[in-house]
């Protein structure tokens, strides 16, 4: 049994919390985030610590306890440090560029693929082949990075495509030619 929900969340000095019933708002140097929590979960603030507790020991309350604690901890980390995902383009002629508020990818299709940024996300391109997705909301950063990767996921034969930096692509052997008679 996991006991993640019982661990208190330490608040950095520059982070402010507002708890209004089931709604929690976190404000810090990088921005602000807010979220509504389920009615089975409560959050209390004691000095520079947050504790997440459940109202009863029912199965749904136990399931949500660790989840909500982690979501609140990610909100605190996001407004204080921020989150970042890096993607790498692998392939001849594969390029990324930023035009206005869109990421433009040339990844082997007959046309460039344009991906608009969601609000709260910053995208930067290092060189021609490294894309850096950053922001305060961990879920939004991950979803945006996954949407970019889904444009051209890495293929198993040559390894070309868009992958997370450091991702291992499982390679397959190509088809072996038939023996001639």
Curated annotation (Swiss-Prot):
GO-annotated biological processes: cytoplasmic translation
Alphabetized InterPro entries for the sequence: Ribosomal_uL6-like, Ribosomal_uL6-like_a/b-dom_sf, Ribosomal_uL6_a/b-dom, Ribosomal_uL6_bac-type, Ribosomal_uL6_CS
Molecular function as annotated in GO: rRNA binding; structural constituent of ribosome
The keyword rRNA-binding appears for this protein: yes
Record bears the keyword Manganese: no
Pfam families according to UniProt: Ribosomal_L6
SUPFAM superfamilies: Ribosomal protein L6
HAMAP family membership: Ribosomal_uL6_B
Family in the record: Belongs to the universal ribosomal protein uL6 family.
Subunit-level organization: Part of the 50S ribosomal subunit.
Protein's recorded name: Large ribosomal subunit protein uL6
Source species: Synechococcus sp. (strain JA-2-3B'a(2-13))
